[in-house]
Amino acid sequence: MAVRVDLNISLDGFATTTDQTADDPMGEDWGRLTAAYAATRTFRERVLHDPSGEGTTEVDDEYAAAYFEGIGAEIMGAGMFGLHANPDDPDWRGWWGDEPPFRVPVFVLTHSPRPPIDMANGTRFIFVDAAPEDVLERARQAAGGRDIRIGGGASVVRDFLKADLVDQLHVGIAPIVLGRRARPTPGEAGPVRTRRGTVRSRGRPG
């Protein structure tokens, strides 16, 4: 069982835009940051529920497929679930739709816990107010021996890295520069301990 982080970052190391609104929950630059990932066959099948077989393949699709492999539980922040879009609506079910791509228990970190939400495809959102170590222990119990993914956003990833709780970083680097956004790494808080890394790339024709 490994604790994994799978995310897309820009060339200057940013993983999240900072201009999210209720009407544009991902932010203006999110499409640029995740363009290669969102164009893959795996993303279209798993997230958009598109059975056509369309979408890119090769290294980008391998990255996207690896995102979902072997996951038994997920941990994410309230923003990634979408709580800030409708914070006062107890019936708000997030912006992932009726069939979220996770299909496993998802622990949502929030200072305002609410009852769990069960979705039709096996996804269960569980809202907790807990430290990284404590929610990770709950996720381990729910994961059934499979891996646990720290899904984001950037501040949640940063907290788990600072606590030295991450075993694997699985990163797709987009060829863009975002400037001042949100970094997933601790920055001035101290170094991140690394274990092993491999690199694959896709060149641009010409």
Question: At which residue positions do the language-model features occur?
Answer:
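Enzymes that bind and transform nitrogen-containing heteroaromatic metabolites
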Residues: M1-G206
